[in-house]
Amino acid sequence: MTPEEAYRWLAEHSLETAYLKSMGHLLGWDQRTHIPAKGHPHRHNQFAMLAKWIHARATDPRLGEALARVEASDLGTDPGAVTAVNVREWRRDYDRAVKIPQELAVALAKATAEGETAWERTRPASDWETFKPFLVTVVALKREEAQALGYAAEPYDAHLDLFEPGETAAGLAPLLEELRVSLLRVLEAVQGSGRRPQSEVVRRHFPVDGQERLAWLAAQSLGYDFAGGRLDPTAHPFSVDIGPGDVRITTRYNEHYFRQAFFGTLHETGHALYDQGLPAEHWGTPRGDTVSLGIHESQSRLWENLVGRSLGFWRFFYPRVQETFAVLQDVPLEVFHFAINEVKPSLIRTEADEVTYNLHILLRFELERALMNGDLQVAELPGAFNDKMCAYLGLTPPDPGQGVMQDVHWSAGLFGYFPTYTLGNLYAAQFYARAEAELGPLEERFAAGDFAPLLTWLRARIHSQGHRLWPRPLVREVTGEELTPQYLVRYLQRRFRALYGLPAGDF
């Protein structure tokens, strides 16, 4: 087999594996939106079978042989070329996969599917004791996985590197600490301002049918292609890339809280815009894939927060909201805009404001790092979670459902995932600042309903690039700088200085 033949075989193998993963994504979407209650056991078996097939393909010895042939040639000499990008990521995936025994891969697939189902069943009643054994199993298997994969400094790094290539806990912790200090200063200034929004205006009665129409309109306005997607209700909102021409979003409606579904929709739309902008001609290979969860999150946060919470956006969209909901016809734009940007520590991460959100992430980062490193046991988790909530946000969850059980991530085995939310916020602010430097002020365009220039900019610099670069190098290429918390901090200072009447200068 020549190097060229080996590369073609690798590309075909990658494409076939991508189809299997696509089937899993479709099954996962169905499980979280439409599956009948009695269908879960069979679905778990389906996931386990898919995991078995995918793992077998990922550890096929022929992959190693073909990679060796290509790597010994000049096909990968240009690090930016499509072939080099694909070979780099195939090698990374293969080396990771062969370290995980098939039995462990299958056990993890089944345990996480069962764990997520158990979470959905027990969370409404805050039934920690029933849920706990499922989480114990998942944590034990994830610890075993970290040992199988290996790591440079600590077990947690093995999981963090999966979601954010090149990132380590030691490299991330200083960024989070610098951000934490700045966020607490902003929070202190806001709480000391004495100015408070009329928060009740977003807690009036908003019938679901009206919210559905607005969610659809908002997603379409930002550029989401409904001919290649759909919007459905779910318990825990997500987006999913089934494949080219099929990128779906979901949201969760609350008739008495406007922000939940609307901003959840903007968030998932941001994810979907990234997936819809990937180069379809490279689908099934790394060059056509996303960079990382953090970069993915940067796209959702950028559209949800930097765009969707801006005054410019609401100058365009608020008249449509008032047309839909008569209960807001007596509420001026500025009052509504202040209400949707209220800063107030909350129990629920997904309902947190922009200032306190990353404090939620920091405590989860510290807890899951301790869990994976063996410094914290599952039985100790509820108490540890409550202690950190009190220390960072001044709140104590009254029950596990509003505390340690509020997120699906750990039951699904997604350790190392939470930090990507904060990385996404950091990336988003830095990308947005660069976009404005190149395009000029964007809020004036938003007020006119013109979101295309920003989307086009993101398409060219991020979406179309696929997995050509890892996160930190991509940030350097797009912005010309290393990743820094300062852009996020400055953005938050500007926004909340205006809303809360704070003095000029840093705080």
What are these regions (language model features)?
Residues 289-333:
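Post-HExxH zinc-binding segment in Zn-dependent metallohydrolases
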Residues 227-228, 280-285, 309-319, 378-379, ...:
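Acidic/polar loop patches that form or flank catalytic/metal-binding clefts of enzymes
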Residues 42, 104-107, 134-137, 175, ...:
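Secondary-structure capping and boundary motifs in well-ordered enzyme cores
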Residues 108-258:
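Contiguous, non-catalytic segments that form substrate-binding/exosite surfaces or channel walls
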Residues 2-6, 22-28, 38, 42, ...:
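C-terminal, non-catalytic "cap/extension" segments appended to globular domains
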Residues 1-165, 468, 493-505:
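A well-structured
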Residues 10, 150, 267, 300, ...:
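Divalent metal-coordination and catalytic microenvironments
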Residues 260-280, 297-301:
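Active-site recognition of the HExxH zinc-binding catalytic motif
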